[in-house]
Amino acid sequence: PPPPDSARSSLQQVRQALEAGVPIKSVTQESAVTSTAKVPDSSAPPAPAAADIPRFSLQLLRSGPCLLLADLPLGEAFQTSDPDFQLLRDVLHAAGLPPPQLLRRGEPIRWPLLSTGALAGTQDGAAARASVRDLLEHETSQQPITFIWLLGPRAMRFANRADEEAELFALTPFLGHVRLWNVPSLEALMQERTLKPQLWQHLQKLMPHWNRHD
């Protein structure tokens, strides 16, 4: 059944905040503590348990006809001097793609979202997935895109349609001719030597698809 109007309204606020790329702080223990006690509203729906609210930070970039959605394990935005960013640049160069460009003014996609110190609407896994996919759909409508690289387990989980579709190196349809590509995280590529040869094998198969759009 369709969500109630209040849920749709709150989810729409979340999506608009993500598309705008405005800096919004993620939930921390400190921000969850208020200085004054409030009388609970018995008519309000129960707040979701903390365990039901996913927490992640993702960086959105573009390289030629490819969008890149990368896990940020520490929650901090990419810096050009970071080893993982340099690795990404090298991988793209080997794939025949231009250097990556940060989108959303470099501001990461953070989840959950806060609005005036409180959770901004629905924050469960389904809401996170819907918001991330809506943001990717918005970006593909702004520029010609054929592939979206999902670098890391969180990018895979919340950009794919369902968790079970997050098989490494799998290609899944997204919107029209755009396809999602599940790729190891940059951190994993730096730590596990066996992943780079596997990545290169898959890159060689896919390179003709995006090089024809140069």
Predicted regions, residues:
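A polyanion-binding, active-site-adjacent surface
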Residues: 1-213
